[in-house]
Amino acid sequence: MKAKIHPKYHQAKARCACGNEFEVGSTSENIRVEICSKCHPFYTGAKGRLVDTTGRVDRFKKKYGLS
């Protein structure tokens, strides 16, 4: 392996939009995610209650007449 070409590896803090924080290994020091295992419907068991902040689901339903 060549010396001094690899990025530095950090224990990074990942912050979710819901406020949850957890540590992961990454080349970045801070990571921001929109959804994590604390707020994702698959892990919480809340089917059909996904928070849609941009209105994409509503626009899709309106466009295809699914609402």
UniProtKB/Swiss-Prot annotation:
Zn(2+) binds at C16, C18, C36, C39. One of its GO terms (molecular function) is metal ion binding. Binds the 23S rRNA. It comes from the Bacteria. One of its GO terms (cellular component) is ribonucleoprotein complex. InterPro entries: Ribosomal_bL28/bL31-like_sf (IPR034704), Ribosomal_bL31 (IPR002150), Ribosomal_bL31_A (IPR027491), Ribosomal_bL31_sf (IPR042105). Its cofactor is Zn(2+). GO terms for biological process: translation. Binds 1 zinc ion per subunit. Pfam families: Ribosomal_L31. Keywords: Metal-binding, Ribonucleoprotein, Ribosomal protein, RNA-binding, rRNA-binding, Zinc. This is Large ribosomal subunit protein bL31. Belongs to the bacterial ribosomal protein bL31 family. Type A subfamily. Part of the 50S ribosomal subunit.
